[in-house]
Amino acid sequence: MAGIPKKLKAALLAVTIAGGGVGGYQEMTRQSLIHLENIAYMPYRDIAGVLTVCVGHTGPDIEMRRYSHAECMALLDSDLKPVYAAIDRLVRVPLTPYQKTALATFIFNTGVTAFSKSTLLKKLNAGDYAGARDQMARWVFAAGHKWKGLMNRREVEMAIWNIRGADDLRQ
């Protein structure tokens, strides 16, 4: 499946084969975010100048120190709770586990508030799945600039959205 790096594709396939394809979109989301965001054990400033650590964690609780892997995973799980809650609360149409995964990584990056007001959500709730997916490609700006890294990320999210099952991941 074009657009998904081999390492991420292998991780998604492993979760799918383990039975995560039906109800385990959370683990696919974790794996996707680890790939898309990477893990930074030391705080840094992202492309928009926001202090960030671990797997895209931001906020006033960041300390200028080295974080452990376990701390990073705990922060990621905590950061994902409002994302999953937003999907459950705002999305009114059925989604495949892969669509939920793509949507969760998108919301993690753009924020729940932005998603809740987006054309993407309006299209999705109107049943326009392709139109909703295509809206992801518009979200490629940070700090007023178009970023290649965000374009690449959206390409991956859109490709995950299109996965139908394990056979797609084996290609």
Curated annotation (Swiss-Prot):
The keyword DNA-binding does not apply. The active site is at 37 (proton donor/acceptor), 46 (proton donor/acceptor). Induction: Expressed in the intermediate phase of the viral replicative cycle. GO terms for biological process: cell wall macromolecule catabolic process; defense response to bacterium; peptidoglycan catabolic process; viral release from host cell by cytolysis. The keyword Hydrolase applies. Its main location: host cell. Its EC number is 3.2.1.17. GO terms for cellular component: host cell plasma membrane; membrane. It comes from Escherichia phage Mu (Bacteriophage Mu). It catalyses: Hydrolysis of (1->4)-beta-linkages between N-acetylmuramic acid and N-acetyl-D-glucosamine residues in a peptidoglycan and between N-acetyl-D-glucosamine residues in chitodextrins. The chain crosses the membrane at residues 1-24. Signal-arrest-release (SAR) endolysin with lysozyme activity that degrades host peptidoglycans and participates with the releasin and spanin proteins in the sequential events which lead to programmed host cell lysis releasing the mature viral particles. The SAR-endolysin is released by the releasin protein into the periplasm, where it breaks down the peptidoglycan layer. Keywords: Antimicrobial, Bacteriolytic enzyme, Cytolysis, Glycosidase, Host cell inner membrane, Host cell lysis by virus, Host cell membrane, Host membrane, Hydrolase, Membrane, Signal-anchor, Transmembrane, Transmembrane helix, Viral release from host cell. It is an enzyme of class 3 (hydrolase). GO terms for molecular function: lysozyme activity. This is SAR-endolysin. It is found in: Host cell inner membrane. The signal-anchor, which may also be an uncleaved signal sequence tethers the SAR-endolysin to the membrane until the latter is depolarized by the holin, resulting in the escape of SAR-endolysin from the membrane. Belongs to the glycosyl hydrolase 24 family. It is a single-pass type II membrane protein. HAMAP family: ENDOLYSIN_T4, SAR_ENDOLYSIN. SUPFAM superfamilies: Lysozyme-like.
